[in-house]
Amino acid sequence: MTVQTFTPNQTTTLDTAKKTIEQQSQELTPSGGNKIGFVSLGCPKNLVDSERILTQLRTEGYEIVNSYHDSDVVIVNTCGFIDSAVQESLDTIGEALKENGKVIVTGCLGAREDEIREVHPGVLGITGPHAYENVLEHVHQFAPKPEHNPFTSLVPDHGVKLTPKHYAYLKISEGCNHRCTFCIIPSMRGDLVSRPVGEILSEAERLKNAGVKELLVISQDTSAYGVDSKHSLGFANGSPVRQNIKALSEELGKMGIWVRLHYVYPYPHVDDLIPLMAEGKILPYLDIPFQHASPNVLKAMKRPGRAERTLDQIKKWREICPELVIRSTFIVGFPGETDEDFEMLLEWLKEAQLDRVGCFKYSPVEGAAANDIDDQISEEVKQERFERFMLVQQEISAAKLQKRIGSTMKVIIDEVDEEGAIGRTYADAPEIDGLVYLNGETSLKAGELVDVLIEHADEYDLWGSLVRA
């Protein structure tokens, strides 16, 4: 049994690879204590929820194991973003019930308890997303707290992490105030609730002290941070800090490690972040989901943006910060998308020259308003548009990476094996973007920052050699 993440055709941009509990075995499994199995599905935001639950379980003395048969209880943290994710979650619950029999369900699908009970009436307990205390209450009921010395710490200061030790996700808020017609996140996770700025910065400091070299800032809507508190003043280390994304980014930028922003909704005040990137305070990397370029489709999605104005914005951003890398996601085959709408999207894509792009064929989500829109698109047309879109972007990406050849770039090493090292530049987020291959460099270590001369490129990845002093 592994801690894993399901990667559905969702409109969020950031996905995590499968992570096994074994990777954290020394932190998670000292002897003694009732044994808990754990499966985590979904996006990085769900992964952070899993880390928080696991941290509390370890704090209370529970042992985390990677086998159904060795577990006293199994927790499944579910995804419910689209129908295929729902099915994956239901299948995983069924597998856990078959292999173990004692299952607690949490996460996004947990908000739809009746649907779970209809398929799997034998689950012990169900909670919605970020209901950490309720999860622990269910665990206490079916696997009582182990006895352990409360003065003996069973977890590191930064808590249990399911990512490699050199990078970590930093969730700054929960929920979303938008009502995009393809999305049901607000119905599962509620409206925006921002974490206190001092709490976020304290966590970031603990992660840095634990050896984290890269913070991946995530939420449902990162650029809306602090809207719910009307951007009131918070405090960090005794000093006042305004609770908005610009001020938070400035404070994170003082830590001297990579800070990467994800899920940045295209508000006008995104303009305020670009100078911070130009000054080197945060990485010049903007993950901003435009979703489409046709005004008709954007209106049907209840998304902001006019094609020409967005192009002007992108041009201005690049003038301020020439090193800026823009990642975005798009949906093709949205209900009502005409041939003209799609051609407009392709022309916009050619003009925008984005660096990293994800494209998803529209997939219906139970409860989403888009399901009621007339003129649903056939799967055949969706696939044809998806392939054409990706071919256009592939050519753009290849041309952009060719320009990297001959330059020296800072690379963070992700893994090393007998063939060499693999890393990423500032232009690449873990799991979703490209890689840099260093063939033969077997003496490097994960988390090292090294200078690399770029010597070769394809459509998505780079190859280079280590620059030695």
UniProtKB/Swiss-Prot annotation:
Positions binding [4Fe-4S] cluster 1 in this chain are 43, 79, 108
Q: Where is the TRAM domain?
A: 402-468
State its Enzyme Commission number(s): 2.8.4.4
Report the locations given in the UniProt record. Cytoplasm
Q: Keywords in alphabetical order, please.
A: 4Fe-4S, Cytoplasm, Iron, Iron-sulfur, Metal-binding, S-adenosyl-L-methionine, Transferase
Using the record's annotation, list all stretches that form the Radical SAM core domain.
Answer: 162-399
The record's SMART domains line, in alphabetical order, gives:
Elp3
Superkingdom is: Bacteria
Q: How is the cofactor bound?
A: Binds 2 [4Fe-4S] clusters. One cluster is coordinated with 3 cysteines and an exchangeable S-adenosyl-L-methionine.
PROSITE patterns for this protein: MTTASE_N, MTTASE_RADICAL, RADICAL_SAM, TRAM
Query: Which residues are noted in the entry as [4Fe-4S] cluster 2-binding?
Result: 176, 180, 183
**Does Metal-binding show up as a keyword for this record?**
yes
The family database entries (CDD domains) matched by this protein are listed as: Radical_SAM
**MTTase N-terminal domain ranges (all copies):** 34-144
Question: Coiled-coil region(s) at which residues?
Answer: none
One Gene Ontology BP term is: tRNA modification
Q: Which reaction does it catalyse?
A: L-aspartate(89)-[ribosomal protein uS12]-hydrogen + (sulfur carrier)-SH + AH2 + 2 S-adenosyl-L-methionine = 3-methylsulfanyl-L-aspartate(89)-[ribosomal protein uS12]-hydrogen + (sulfur carrier)-H + 5'-deoxyadenosine + L-methionine + A + S-adenosyl-L-homocysteine + 2 H(+)
Q: Does the keyword 4Fe-4S apply?
A: yes
| Needed cofactors | [4Fe-4S] cluster
GO molecular function per UniProt: 4 iron, 4 sulfur cluster binding; aspartic acid methylthiotransferase activity; metal ion binding; protein methylthiotransferase activity
Question: Which SUPFAM superfamilies did the record assign?
Answer: Radical SAM enzymes
**Pfam families in UniProt:** Radical_SAM, TRAM_2, UPF0004
The UniProt function text for this chain reads: Catalyzes the methylthiolation of an aspartic acid residue of ribosomal protein uS12.
Protein name, as recorded: Ribosomal protein uS12 methylthiotransferase RimO
* Organism of origin: Vibrio vulnificus (strain YJ016)
